[in-house]
A protein has these predicted regions:
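Extracytosolic ligand-binding ectodomains
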Residues: 2-7, 12-14, 27-396
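N-terminal signal peptide c-region/cleavage motif recognized by signal peptidases
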Residues: 22-25
Length: 396
């Protein structure tokens, strides 16, 4: 073989080896995409931003440790659902089919998540709910079921709402004022069940549309029926209208709410009596923090200039639920050893423990239970000077 031929052969071999190595490195560095469909505009935009921050913080931590599956970084891809189920499904389809996300996260609105869940079950893409609490999101009847959640669950919240109203306000005849959508329906069912378990009759059940501006007629009927407390289920805008309607009536009645008011500009929209609404949360950055909590606060302050302390981390549940949900999803992917949807789904069941922000999780998911949080993880809160604080806590 001539010198030229040997050099040509050697050059070709080196080029082939380089290409193979480059291809392997490129594959190893290919991002694992994490999708998010949530409200990023409108009255509930703060909820979407909180979820985004919790996810990104967890993603940063995973990537700082070398990523997953041999060095692949996680990458967040967001889409705005505008709190609209149809737009949420369109966004989810894009993230699943075009972006090829390994896990899809949802947002605040139960109707949007409930519209997306059939799609993820069909396409075998794991779904993680960091906020929407509708019971049927995870208990959807699908087998296999790809929907998981790190958040409150309506049927559990409803029992907690009744217990809180009885203990805090000595309520014996609560009334319900609910948004007329699947989330309201989920809570109507749960509240009626909780009341039946205690042998209590509701003063009445009243509903309103999400865009209604005047709930005085419904509230007047509940007052006439003798309601001594109100169970409120609605997101930011309509919850604020309920408070303003109570103001116009001059009716001072305890309001025990699901966590809808925490999702946006509630104090701005509801006025000074926003402080009188007590609502459920899954976490607060106020008070004594665990080492994980202290680390998360420090990281948020460093990453986001607008955050100076706990009062600026709002809504806290969006950050906390998303943070823990992302770390659990990362553990599931690691357990799966790939981004295959069914393998990741089964990977969630293989998580033995995780020392999280909200709590230390022990076997957070099983085939029979796709909800990682329970009643013991709830905190009751209210607005104090535009800050969400645990009830009774007035200082940082």
């Amino acid at each position: 073989m001539s010198l030229f031929a040997r050099r040509t052969l050697l050059s070709s071999a080196c080029a082939f080896a380089f290409a193979a190595l480059w291809g392997t490195a490129a594959a190893a560095a290919e991002p694992i995409k994490i999708g998010l469909v949530t409200a990023l505009s409108g009255q509930s935009a703060l909820s979407g931003e909180a979820i985004s921050r919790g996810l990104q913080l967890a993603i940063d931590e995973v990537n700082a440790k070398g990523g997953l599956l041999g060095g692949r970084p996680l990458e967040l891809v967001r889409r705005d659902d505008e709190a609209n189920p149809a737009k949420g499904v369109v966004a989810a389809r894009e993230l699943i089919y075009k972006e090829k996300v390994a896990v899809l996260f949802g947002g605040l609105d139960t109707p949007v998540s409930m519209a997306i869940v059939p799609l993820v079950n069909q396409e075998k893409v794991p779904f993680m709910g960091p906020w929407a609490a509708g019971t049927p999101i995870t208990k959807n009847g699908a087998n296999p079921n790809y929907a998981f959640r790190v958040s409150a669950v309506d049927e559990t919240v409803d029992r907690a709402m009744l217990q809180y109203a009885q203990k805090t306000f000595k309520s014996a005849k609560p009334g319900m004022i609910l948004v007329n959508n699947p989330w309201g329906e989920s809570n109507e069912k749960g509240l009626k069940s909780a009341l039946a378990e205690k042998g209590i009759a509701a003063a009445g059940v009243e509903k309103f549309e999400a865009g209604d501006l005047d709930m005085v007629p419904q509230l007047t009927r509940l007052k006439a029926a003798g309601a001594d407390s109100l169970f409120l289920v609605a997101n930011v805008g309509p919850s604020a209208q309920v408070v303003k309607s109570l103001d116009r009536m001059g009716w001072k009645v305890p309001v025990v709410s699901h966590w809808g008011p925490a999702g946006g500009r509630f104090t701005e929209l509801a006025g000074p009596n926003a402080k009188d609404v007590h609502f459920v949360q899954t976490y607060s950055f106020f008070g004594k923090q665990s080492p994980v909590g202290e680390r998360v606060i420090k990281s948020l302050v460093a990453k986001y200039p607008a955050i100076k302390g706990p009062g600026d981390i709002t809504p806290a549940v969006g950050v906390a639920n998303a943070y823990d949900g992302m770390h659990l999803a990362a553990l599931a992917i690691a357990q799966a050893g790939s981004t295959d949807g069914d393998a990741v789904r089964q990977g969630f069941y293989k998580i033995a423990s995780y020392d999280g922000l909200i709590k230390s999780y022990k076997t957070p998911f099983t085939a029979a239970n796709h909800d990682a949080l329970g009643a013991d993880d709830y905190v009751w809160a209210q607005f104090v000077d535009n800050r969400i604080l645990p009830v009774g806590l007035t200082t940082n």
